[in-house]
């Protein structure tokens, strides 16, 4: 009897060890692979890959995130990370980026700046009335451009050359990352600001907002998620998000389930994601780098 018990215990121990090893192997297989790291940036906040043009646009705050000293600029980085060049300068503290009809838009403190890509020149600065801190940008297929107001809450919309507050609800306090998904604008938030810098009294949320009637639907099951920044839709109710303060990139599933993808340290900002190649381009504001990872 004793021998049988010992034998059974040995088998169970072996099975547990095997499962642990298999689990570790699966985790290793699923971990993103680092492809390259580009240096020479200045507090990079957002990366946007235009694979057809063979370039990654990167906004550089270059100082105070709320500053208006015209030190900010947009850089162009090659898809292999080997070439970094300053492209458009004279900005305040540019953040989110989106392309629409051959123009690159960036949230620049209190203005939505419009850049003609072919000319490499600023063609318009759309002053957002009452904006606290404009941040991420998204464009729909009708040419409308949306920009989050992290400082003042909610979202502005540029349509027909006119910019106005489009969404102003309590749930969107500290609105940050934006992504168009079908007929909805996906919004993640930094959290409710206390008025002391970027300190929050409660963490950020994951929301879906109907473009047709502005109906807000919670994707997080009513639970707070983090000091959210980057956002990309993976389809099927799944998203990639970044938590700037925690320094992590995570997979988020509607309902609130999360899985850590990368742990890179504080300052992990508004990444760019190319779904075709499954490459994520992560700007590190505190390290002045842009790093590319291949997702599994």
What are the language-model segments listed below?
Residues 1-9:
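Bacterial N-terminal signal peptides that target proteins for export
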Residues 15-24:
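C-terminal segment of classical bacterial N-terminal signal peptides
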Residues 32-38, 82-88, 121-127, 163-168, ...:
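A short beta-strand motif characteristic of beta-propeller blades
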Residues 41-53, 64, 68-71, 88-105, ...:
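Beta-rich, blade/repeat-based domains predominating
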Residues 59-79:
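Beta-propeller domains
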Residues 72-75, 111-113, 154-156, 205-207, ...:
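A short loop-to-beta-strand structural motif that recurs across blades of beta-propeller domains
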Residues 78-82, 116-121, 158-162, 210-214, ...:
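Short loop/turn segments that connect beta-strands within beta-propeller blades
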Residues 201-260:
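Glycine/small-residue-rich hydrophobic helix-like segments
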